[in-house]
Structure formats: structure tokens, C-alpha cells
UniProtKB/Swiss-Prot annotation:
Superkingdom per UniProt: Bacteria
Keyword RNA-binding: yes
The keyword RNA-binding belongs to this UniProt entry's keyword annotation: yes
One cellular component (GO) term of this entry: cytosol
GO biological process assignments: DNA-templated transcription termination; transcription antitermination
Protein name according to UniProt: Transcription antitermination protein NusB
Record function comment: Involved in transcription antitermination. Required for transcription of ribosomal RNA (rRNA) genes. Binds specifically to the boxA antiterminator sequence of the ribosomal RNA (rrn) operons.
Gene source species: Clavibacter sepedonicus (Clavibacter michiganensis subsp. sepedonicus)
Record keywords, A-Z: RNA-binding, Transcription, Transcription antitermination, Transcription regulation
HAMAP family to which the protein is assigned, alphabetical: NusB (MF_00073)
Length: 137
């Protein structure tokens, strides 16, 4: 597993935990940063995980508005928390990280959905992110 793939998973953990616990993302990031500092093998992926989470916080309103706009018959509040977190990461990478090709952002998000969410989530995430990427092109 590449360092960026691990970082996406760590960012997903941060967004998911903050969402489920009703905590702020910066507070959850602070806890994770302490954990990463204590475990050298986590430090390689930590910088990009933090960049993703902080980037989402900076652009949360825009990202969540896109999710609401492009999700058919699913409000943000109604979708599973893990799917919300995956979509937020994928959209942030598509819109705000020029170093990651859209196809890679979509593929990595679909892989996360396949391994961590429902059977239908991977195709839902794929369709949503593909439509958003196409609209931004």
C-alpha cells in the first residue's frame, strides 16, 4: 500500500471519527497528530492525511454543496458517514489537489468504499465523483 493510499485512509479515519463523535476536525486531527508522532511508521503518511483533512475544513461548504447537488435521492445527512467521508476526500483531491489526477482520486475513493462500506457504495462513489470531475473539466 502506497504512502498516499495510507494517508487517504488516515484522513478518512479523521473525518469519520469527527463526524460520528460530533467533534471538530481540528480537534480530531490534534489527537491523531499525537498518535502519529508516537509511531514513526505512521509519520510517512501523516503529512498528506493532514493536508487532506485541513483542505476539507477549508473548503467544507463548497464540497458539501457539491455532494448535495450531485447525489440523487440522498441528502448528506442520510448517507452513511463513511460514504460522506470518502466523497469529501475524493472531491477535495479532484478540486483542490492538482498533483492527483482525477482518475486516481476516483479509483482510490472507490477502493475505500469497496473495502469499508456497503455493496452499493463503490458504484455510488464512482458515479458521484465521475460526474463532479466531468463538470469541473
Amino acid at each position: 500500500m502506497s504512502a498516499r493510499t495510507k494517508a487517504r485512509k488516515r484522513a478518512l479515519d479523521v473525518l469519520y471519527v469527527a463526524d460520528i463523535r460530533g467533534e471538530s476536525i481540528p480537534a480530531t486531527l490534534a489527537v491523531e497528530q499525537q498518535r502519529a508522532a508516537a509511531e514513526p511508521d505512521r509519520q510517512a503518511s501523516w503529512a498528506y492525511a493532514r493536508e487532506i483533512a485541513e483542505g476539507f475544513v477549508e473548503h467544507q461548504d463548497e464540497i458539501d454543496e457539491l455532494i448535495e447537488t450531485y447525489s440523487v435521492n440522498w441528502t448528506l445527512a442520510r448517507m452513511p458517514a463513511v460514504d460522506r467521508a470518502i466523497l469529501r476526500i475524493g472531491i477535495w483531491e479532484i478540486l483542490f489537489n492538482a498533483d492527483v489526477p482525477d482518475g486516481v482520486a476516483i479509483s482510490e475513493s472507490v477502493d475505500l468504499a469497496s473495502s469499508l462500506s456497503t455493496d452499493e457504495s463503490a458504484s455510488f462513489v464512482n458515479g458521484m465523483l465521475a460526474r463532479i470531475a466531468a463538470a469541473q473539466a
